Amino acid sequence: MSLIPWLRWNDTPPRLSARTPAEMVLETLMMELAGQMREVERQQRERRSAVRKICTGVDYSWLANTPRPTYDISPGERLQLEDVCAKIHPSYCGPAILRFRQLLAEREPEVQEVARLFRSVLQEALEKMKQEEEAHKLTRQWSLRPRGSLSSFKTRARIAPFASDIRTISEDVERDAPPPPRTWSMPEFRAPQAD
């Protein structure tokens, strides 16, 4: 007799997250911002210590470990960023993070500039969302328009004169020109000319 069924009675069934997709996007984007700010701060410290080593020629970093002051954005700015993050659709979260990382790699900003870059990336994502929504609305309008069948399709305007009615200069020249000499193997079928 197996004990596995007896051991399973105490297991809790797996629960799905009670968070909405908007909350998950908000949390993901804000975690990305915090992580990138820590990374930029670490890179700045490394650059400063490298410059200090070059200037002084001595490395005392092993001797004393100074407390690291961390930069944090203001609560008002954090709330504004959270508000913008909540408007981002989940499908735009990944591309926004990739664009943010790309801008950080290209520009190597100071810690104070990271939040501003993040806001600009979020604004780009919102603009792209609006453009795609407008395009989707236009395609929906075109797809919902009533269509006439091809059997009831009639041309409303006729182009006149038709190409066969238009006289060209080459036709006038050909009428006044003498007929080309005929070859002996071909009979000549012409009406006699009345002069």
UniProtKB/Swiss-Prot annotation:
Major localization class: other
Chain residue ranges for the region called Disordered: 168-195
Compositionally biased intervals (Basic and acidic residues): 168-177
GO cellular component, one term: cone photoreceptor outer segment
Domain of life: Eukaryota
Tissue specificity note: Expressed in the retina and in particular in the inner nuclear layer, in rod and cone outer segments, in the outer nuclear layer, in the outer plexiform layer and in the ganglion cell layer.
Coiled coil: 22-54
Keywords: Cell projection, Coiled coil, Cytoplasm, Endosome, Nucleus, Sensory transduction, Vision
InterPro entries in alphabetical order: RD3 (IPR028092)
Alphabetical GO biological process terms: negative regulation of guanylate cyclase activity; protein transport; retina development in camera-type eye; visual perception
Subcellular location: Cell projection, Cilium, Photoreceptor outer segment; Photoreceptor inner segment; Endosome; Nucleus
PANTHER family: PROTEIN RD3, RENTINAL DEGENERATION 3-LIKE
Subunit: Monomer. Interacts with GUCY2E; promotes the exit of GUCY2E from the endoplasmic reticulum and its trafficking to the photoreceptor outer segments. The interaction with GUCY2E negatively regulates its activity. Interacts with GUCY2F; promotes the exit of GUCY2F from the endoplasmic reticulum and its trafficking to the photoreceptor outer segments. The interaction with GUCY2F negatively regulates its activity. Interacts with GUK1; up-regulates GUK1 activity.
Illness: A spontaneous mutation leading to a frameshift and in an unstable truncated protein lacking the C-terminal 89 amino acids causes retinal degeneration. Homozygotes mice (called rd-3) display retinal degeneration, beginning at 3 weeks of age, characterized by complete loss of photoreceptor rod cells by 5 weeks, and cones by 8 weeks.
Function: Plays a critical role in the regulation of enzymes involved in nucleotide cycle in photoreceptors. Inhibits the basal catalytic activity and the GCAP-stimulated activity of GUCY2E and GUCY2F, two retinal guanylyl cyclases involved in the production of cGMP in photoreceptors. Involved in the transport of GUCY2E and GUCY2F to their target sites in the photoreceptor outer segment. Up-regulates the activity of GUK1, a kinase that also plays an essential role for recycling GMP and indirectly, cGMP. Plays an important role for the survival of rods and cones in the retina.
Protein name per the record: Protein RD3
